[in-house]
């Protein structure tokens, strides 16, 4: 579009690609357009490369999120309802922000059964770099939101966060007819039929000597506070 040429009239040669394809999917567009305009104007091949300082200033990074939540829970730490609001700093262009923000929403439950949940996502256009794909692609941001809520509940009730996590874990179900254990479902309606979060957590607590180490830490803190 920048050159007024048809797609089949443009030839692009790339020496090597390497990895991290998500971040390269659209972040090179600005350079590509500049090269195309220069090549058409001079009728010569054109090659451009950012130096490292310009690269860091211009190219997008991981999407930073602000996640607000309101959560209701009982005295055991069981989540009765939760409402998330995601505020996503996308930058000056859309890039891959929509699927990144979507995936954060889809990971908002992490390993927990949220029976009554609302998730709202606000994708913010800002005067900063256009953020892009990064390892996890929005998943870690969504997970951090619910984990922060779990820690908040545990602190409020003076419970071990492990207890709050365990009581809220998905339990395994089955899709077989006649089985009384109906699968729980994710906020987007997917049946959970193979969750082993409780079992693996119990194994880890035993093999890590969690309780004895926790008591030792409490005793040390008491004696040295």
Which residues fall in each region the model found?
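Structural alpha/beta core scaffold segments of enzyme domains
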Residues: 1-225
